[in-house]
UniProtKB/Swiss-Prot annotation:
Protein name, UniProt field: Cryptochrome DASH, chloroplastic/mitochondrial
All copies of domain Photolyase/cryptochrome alpha/beta, residue ranges: 78-219
Alphabetized Pfam families for the sequence: DNA_photolyase, FAD_binding_7
Organism this protein belongs to: Solanum lycopersicum
Other known facts: 5,10-methenyltetrahydrofolate (MTHF) acts as a functional antenna for the photoreduction of FAD.
One BP annotation, GO: photoreactive repair
Family recorded in the similarity comment: Belongs to the DNA photolyase class-1 family.
Amino acid sequence: MIKQPFLLTKFTPFSSKSKHTLFTFHCNFSIKMASLTARTTPTVQNVPGLTPEEMERVCEQTFQRYESGGLGKRKGKGVAIVWFRNDLRVLDNEALLRAWVSSEAILPVYCVDPRLFGTTHYFGMPKTGALRAQFIIECLNDLKRNLVKRGLDLLIQHGKPEDIVPSLAKAYKAHTVYAHKETCSEEVKVEKMVTRNLQKLVSPSSGGIGNDPGSGNTTKLELVWGSTMYHIDDLPFDCESLPDVYTQFRKSVEYKSKVRNCTKLPTSFGPPPEVGDWGHVPQVSELGLQQEKVSKGMNFVGGESAALGRVHDYFWKKDLLKVYKETRNGMLGADYSTKFSPWLASGSLSPRFIYEEVKRYEKERLSNDSTYWVLFELIWRDYFRFLSIKLANLLFQAGGPQKVNINWSQDQTMFDAWRRGQTGYPLIDANMKELAATGYMSNRGRQIVCSFLVRDMGIDWRMGAEWFETCLLDYDPCSNYGNWTYGAGVGNDPREDRYFSIPKQAQNYDPEGEFVAYWLPELRALPREKRHSPGMMYLNPIVALKHGYTKKTGDSKTAFSSRRGRPEDNRRKRHGY
């Protein structure tokens, strides 16, 4: 593999050639944002809204809460490698803990894989735009700092993991490489190549025996599960028998499964082995991407310290968890929803930690529908990850899991108008401009622009999914492609009509036109009632809407999720919560 949180696309791994013109997408990371109620142009809003000193303090206090002297004396021998991928955190990192238990020295490594910065499978868009690249860079810098504080460091190597990891295992005579298991084909293929190349090596056993070619001991890759709230081994069914309907999955795991505790932290993970050159975290320009400044929108700060800071800020400092269910459908501002998804996608934030913080909040403050709803969203995230195992590459094919035969258009001019926010529909255009400028879009916005692309424009849903892959900070393949298959009507859901009426969505979720006026300044001077229907004051609509209003918005099943009604009535995944 967002991965709520990152990742690669699926299909023929790494060798695909673009069938369409390569998109030139120059992202940037200065993501700024408006306040919920501001009627004039707001200033930049950082997420989390804490100073660097506050984030560091919250991070250290959280780590201290999870430190345990009860882990016992370290008895392992030799060197173990921790191969970081989409698990860029110290807290609740089972791969890191297992390496500590089994060794006397840990070598943490991150591989800057050039394939992550290649092009998507079908339409040749950048796999990773500059915004997400910058976010990952910040995550790596923060991970390196936190590891150093705990007696380690982070080795940064540029190249393919299947070459780098076995080479390091041989050089440091490592007995085991620990990593978190991924679920989608490109990442799984890399895991298999790493395993195959490790098997060609002969290394010492964990008992510290020398590197004797006759000993027959090979370095092994040990994959652990740590990307979901519910552990895969605790599901009441195997993934091949996963229910096709989310509600059945949710009810089953809530009734029959327990969420495991976060792993404890030793006081120190050190020492590392002797390393001559730890390398450096790259700059965006070193990845062949261009960084540009923007002056509006949310500025997400990458890294575990920022992630823990956001949880603290949203739950405890601002006390917003208690109203989450009422505000989560907002579109403008940093605090209408948790905004945890970018850190979940990068693995900078553990879903089990969020679970434990929700339970602590319920114990110390209050328990209501809002506190439950955050967990409800995390179960959606779990569901799509487990579903990706069951569906494999069907998740990424035009017909989707249902193998539906639809004659999609791939009109490049029409698609470009959509991705650039030039459709003539202010609500669509404002959302697309926010995405390009910030790497983020509200859950409500994602539903609306998906419905418009596939229902009103008739464009191939995979073009939209790949553009989201380029742009989103919280991209992960399971959630992204799972949501798009549902929105396109080719997913596992038995209901097919997920049309979103733009006039109705505008009326319900941006009645004053503040969101569209913020992202489309040319509409700001118009009366509020005219901002969504500006007529000659705005671009001509690129297509006519198939429906003006529809009964299938609100509490019905829609593109990414409609967030009304009881949990039983919701069938869509939430992304960007």
